[in-house]
């Protein structure tokens, strides 16, 4: 199986690796895993007062496709509203990275991580 140039680029030069303080009320965190392959993905978003994602970070333990999916998604969500970020689908990620069918689950993880981070952010805001 050969990886696409985009997967290789995001794997060798991942964007936005790291984490934010989870106690920050403007940060939403999503942690998801895939029992099928052991990949674990943590994705965090930082949202400004206007409801726009101003920054994103990730830490992923997994294959090149999982790391590339995380890296790509953190780039995509920056500058988007929560609704726009929520609308990102795994098929968009898989298509952009040209993932082979056996690696589609990596793009599903990335979509799930975005949704989990948004849900976490919203639950923090509602708790105020």
Curated annotation (Swiss-Prot):
Changing residue 89 to A: Stabilizes apo-protein in the D-state; Fe-S cluster assembly 3-fold slower than wild-type. One of its GO terms (molecular function) is zinc ion binding. Changing residue 39 to A/L/V: Stabilizes apo-protein in the S-state (structured). GO terms for biological process: intracellular iron ion homeostasis; iron-sulfur cluster assembly; L-cysteine catabolic process. It comes from the Bacteria. Carboxymethylation by iodoacetic acid blocks sulfur transfer to this protein. Changing residue 39 to G: No effect on equilibrium between S- and D-state (disordered). It holds the Pfam family NifU_N. This is Iron-sulfur cluster assembly scaffold protein IscU. It comes from Escherichia coli (strain K12).
């Amino acid at each position: 199986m050969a990886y696409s140039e985009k997967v290789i680029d995001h794997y060798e030069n991942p964007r936005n690796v790291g984490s934010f303080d989870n106690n920050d009320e403007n940060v939403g965190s999503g942690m998801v895993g895939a029992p099928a392959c052991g990949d674990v993905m943590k994705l965090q978003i930082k949202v400004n007062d206007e409801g726009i994602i101003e920054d994103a970070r990730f830490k992923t333990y997994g294959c090149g496709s999982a790391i590339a999916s995380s890296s790509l998604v953190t780039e995509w969500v920056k500058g988007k509203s929560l609704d726009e970020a929520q609308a990102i689908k795994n098929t968009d990620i898989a298509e952009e990275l040209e993932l082979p069918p056996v690696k589609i689950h990596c793009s599903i993880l990335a979509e799930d991580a975005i949704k989990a981070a948004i849900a976490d952010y919203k639950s923090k805001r509602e708790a105020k």
